[in-house]
A protein has these predicted regions:
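Iron-sulfur cluster-binding electron-transfer modules in prokaryotic oxidoreductases
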Residues: 1-174
Length: 174
């Protein structure tokens, strides 16, 4: 044993496993955080300070494993809204009604073409509100949204970026 008291994971699927499945087997003896919760804790404790010079519009894609499983909707948006120089824009389909990107649930493994089409539709949702950055809290979503963006003609997708929320926070630390 490492003696660790906390475990932080940036993976939505791993977080779901540590929070919902492993406790059925036994007590981990750890406080488990998704990176979004941990970042929020650090911000609220004053341990993270932001600079802000991006001047970009950002939106948040709700990963199925965080949104539907844990109702984690406000926390990531609150983090993004605290970064100076970022303008938060909300996609029409968000929260429980957010469109799945196709990166999880076996879609990508069983029907990769459909998964990319689903991701492209989600990227179009972000483009429709003028977003220049799509943030997410799930590596599978990030990777599949990137594939979806590449499937959209360059003149339509522009220079939209797909980033994990931890990357956005790290890039804007004081």
């Amino acid at each position: 044993a490492t003696g660790a008291r906390e475990l932080v994971t940036p993976c939505a699927g791993c977080y779901k496993t540590f929070q919902k499945i492993y406790p059925e087997i036994g007590d981990l003896g750890l406080e488990v955080y998704h990176s979004i919760h941990y970042l929020e804790k650090l911000i609220n404790d004053g341990r993270i300070k932001f600079k802000g010079d991006l001047g970009k519009k950002v939106t948040y894609h709700d990963p199925c494993d965080l949104g539907r499983a844990f109702k984690m909707f406000d926390e990531p948006r609150n983090i993004l809204k605290q970064i100076p120089g970022l303008e938060y824009v909300e996609m029409a389909r968000n929260g429980l009604k957010a469109r799945c990107c196709g990166g999880g649930g076996g879609v990508l493994a069983n029907n990769p073409e459909m998964a990319v089409e689903m991701a492209a539709e989600r990227v179009r949702d972000a483009l429709a509100v003028g977003a220049e950055i799509i943030a997410s809290g799930c590596a599978a979503c990030k990777d599949n949204l990137k594939k979806g963006a590449k499937a959209i003609p360059k003149q339509e997708r522009g220079k939209i970026k797909i980033q994990d929320i931890t990357e956005i926070v790290a890039g804007n630390l004081e």
